[in-house]
Amino acid sequence: MHLFIGVGASATFGPLMADMSQWFVRHRGIAVSIAASGNYIGGVLWPPVLQHAMATGGWRHTYLGVGMFCALATLPFIVALRRARPIAGMLEAASTRSAHNLGVSPNALMVLLCVAGLACCVAMAMPQVHIVAYCGDLGYGPARGAEMLSAMLGFGILSRIGSGLMADRLGGAPTLLIGSVLQGIALFLYLLFDGLVSLYIISALFGLFQGGIVPMYAIIVREYFSPKEVGIRIGIVLMATLFGMALGGWMSGIIFDYTGSYRAAFLNGLIWNVVNAVIVVWLLLRPTPRLAAA
């Protein structure tokens, strides 16, 4: 069941961001970020609905209802999507940046982006996956943790929109670095404070800081690779970020089992966050030609 859910999600999120990056040039950042905000909006709206549905009708009827709703809501929008942009038009609007201008091969740059995506999402997974359990461990109860998770996702929407606007002015890599540094600061704050009010505030800040990180990889790929390759390359990098989320959630759980505390798990997330920031700094320090006027 979860395999089919994953396959279905992969057929929408990555291709949608790749398609949006092809249609927009001047406002590409905000366009991609708006498209990427859908899953965060769902993360805010669905949990209370699902909680009520499962309490009243059980999980089977809830899953069936969600499936029917998704099918009925998604199919009409798929029909309404515009056709893919002609390759010729995309090539004319392509950036003068390329992996070769960085002094590395395209495949080497892809590996670096995948490692960066994996590292940032290992760090990102610690609060997102374990905040509910963390609140239970502190004695606040899982309900408080669920509220903090909703706050993360809610402020993540603002983060994605803001990061998109920033990317249109600064570029994908600088915006990614800003998000990575701020995410590291939020993780560090989790180490310093564990009061209930503090956790609410830090969780909101974490969502506000990290929400725009993942869409920036789509922007960076579009900036440095040929439009003909954008779909497959964005898909590969997003796969690395999702693997990082899975690895980070599992790794944090293992660390908690061995240490009996989430403190070491937060430290582990900080280390992975530094790896991400180092790669992005390297990317920014490489000499690149000026962008052609769009």
Regions found by a protein language model. Name each.
Residues 45-57, 135-136, 166-167, 251-260:
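Interfacial helix-cap and linker-helix signal at transmembrane-aqueous boundaries
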Residues 35, 39-86:
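Helix-loop-helix hairpin linking two adjacent transmembrane segments in secondary transporters
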